[in-house]
Amino acid sequence: MVARIFKIIVIAMIALIVFVIWAGMSLFRGIDLGGTGHSTSPGIIDEYKARKIKMEKMEQLQANLEFVCKHEEKPELLPETQQLYNYALYHDLHNMWTGKRGDAVWNGLARYYRIAAMNGDYKANIRLQYLLKSGRISSDMPQTEVHNLNEELAKQLPATAYYNLYGYLDVGYGVRTEKDGKYAYLRKAADLGSREAQYVVADILGDINDEETLQMRLEIIEKLRTCASEQGLGKASNSLGIGFIIDKEYAKALEAFHQGVKNGDSQSALQLANGFNEKTRPDDKLNFINLQPDLERSYRYKIIEDYLYEKDYLQPKVPDLDDIVPLPPAPLPEWDGKIAFQRWFEGEAPPKPDEALVRRLAWQAGLNGDTG
């Protein structure tokens, strides 16, 4: 009996020892204690490799997205070509609401735009491309003429020309490229200083759904929008201002919206009209900018907002804003209720350019003096 009990105890102890050894091996199997007799768990290796690859991708992404703000340098415009441009623009804009595509007004103005553009006037070039592409000015080969104009524009404003090319590739307007090849032109345009390209790149970065790169992308987006805003793009200013409101950086929001009004953005004007309104409370997350209520400032911004909104098709700007509603604490000057663009638009038409000048410029550019 005793021998039997002893045998059971011995078997139990052996079983316990085997269990302890097995448990110990399981516990330490994934631990590298040094030397050559141990191996690292495949799971740990895979996790390390994945982390390393992700870090490398982040570094590469950051390098690819690195952005240094560049403003597009605009060459000086000749007074002679500006005579043609200003005359054409005045009548062109007055035809925008009631005119029909290919009508006598726009086709008659094409001559002045063409001659000015081919004499290096980038404003005439940009406007003429728009009028041709939209069909307002008739042409036997509009796509060919537009692309020839854009090649000429590249001599004065390469960034804008690259952005135009991106736009034409995007809609297949007479040019083709490999799939997604258009984005190379967009990035090039942004780097060279196109404000429109900078804004579009910012929007593309904002649409990426990736939490890990979010902070990095937000910083680049702000740089891009700031750069575009500084160069006169109103919607970039407004986007900046909204972002600053979300972050409760109200002083920055005020400056961004004020710049947006100068750049012709009606939404920025509305933000400031509401921001200075005494009815706007801190719980109004869309309009509160932490401003001292000022009914006259609010009223002036609202007048400007109404005009910019109603005349959006004319693309008016307000470079004279500081003479109308300077930022506080500057006092408000006298104001007749009109912005400078409005006075120009409602005023008399510029004088018709001298015919001898028109023909001389046409000859100078190798163009037909009658049609451009």
Describe the residue ranges of each PLM region.
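N-terminal Sec-pathway targeting helices
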Residues: 1-17
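N-terminal leader/linker segments that initiate helical-solenoid repeat arrays
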Residues: 22-108, 119
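Short helix-capping/linker turns of helical repeat alpha-solenoids
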Residues: 77-80, 84, 94, 119-122, ...
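Structural signature of tandem alpha-helical TPR/SEL1-like repeats
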Residues: 101-111, 138-149, 175-185, 210-224, ...
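TPR/TPR-like alpha-solenoid helical repeat scaffolds
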Residues: 128-136, 201-208, 242, 270-282, ...
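TPR/TPR-like (Sel1-like) alpha-helical repeat modules
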Residues: 254-266, 273-282, 287-311
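Short coil/turn linking the two alpha-helices of tandem helical-hairpin repeats
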Residues: 88-101, 129-140, 166-176, 202-214, ...
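Canonical positions in the second alpha-helix
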Residues: 73, 115-116, 150-153, 188-189, ...
